[in-house]
């Protein structure tokens, strides 16, 4: 099928240009000529299966039969979901604890999109006295996600495969280096350096009480809640090495060589305190009254730091970048 792709590309390009122009490249990453197309046909007829040759200048010439989506996706993947709960009650004390872990090993064959989620909930109450009950409800979650990215100009992996994942261009050169077409697309994932790592944590807790007085006619209730939400991201972008000539290495998107760290924190607190009184007088008159107080506050803080000039392609700490830094701080309440 590889030679048919090259022929169809030529026919489509030639027709689009009113049969007056021949292509010089397949988009930007593979050279094209009528001589190359004829050579491709000849190699097919002669049963030559080598996908890469080297011309007199040392440049690689490709006659590939590559399936870029086969290289992009795994044949199989694995996900796991575990749940556990414990409950108990002895009359004065009751509790419920549950936990969940979900893990997904990702869909991509290289630099895969791992996802992990952990949830924990614990709630309970205790009847301290006949007139006083205390309750607590805690919820915690932690999420980790790795999102691989492309530094090629197209942005997404699917767009870049559409633009540059030519079946006639293999992914690897004979020396194991990436081809130009691969570097623009799935080769970025194979290199495995570019991506966004996200970690989100949420901790919420509510503590409350209920008190009864005057033969259960007066009730006082109160609670205090806090919720801390932490959102963190680390993005790394580095150039992708590839080769078009034997023994020579160049870099795609050399302008990208940076690390960005983003941290956002939201702190929320709320408290409620109210009392109600109800009574029936003389079997004919009913009275009920309520008074209460509420307070809420939310504070948001964010820090954004980006710095270029990474010492190593796999640096994970902003301190391992020696270039220019951009810092942004935000605070709202």
Language model features with spans:
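A beta-strand signature from Gram-negative outer-membrane beta-barrel systems
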Residues: 1, 79-81, 94
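Surface-exposed loop/interface segments of Gram-negative outer-membrane beta-barrel transport/assembly proteins
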Residues: 1-65, 102, 106-204, 221-330
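Periplasmic N-terminal accessory/gating domains of Gram-negative outer-membrane beta-barrel systems
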Residues: 67-73, 77
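Outer-membrane beta-barrel initiation region
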Residues: 74-76, 86-90
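Residue-level signature of outer-membrane beta-barrel architecture
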Residues: 88-90, 126-127, 209-213, 277-279
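N-terminal hydrophobic signal/anchor transmembrane helix of membrane proteins
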Residues: 211, 217, 226-228
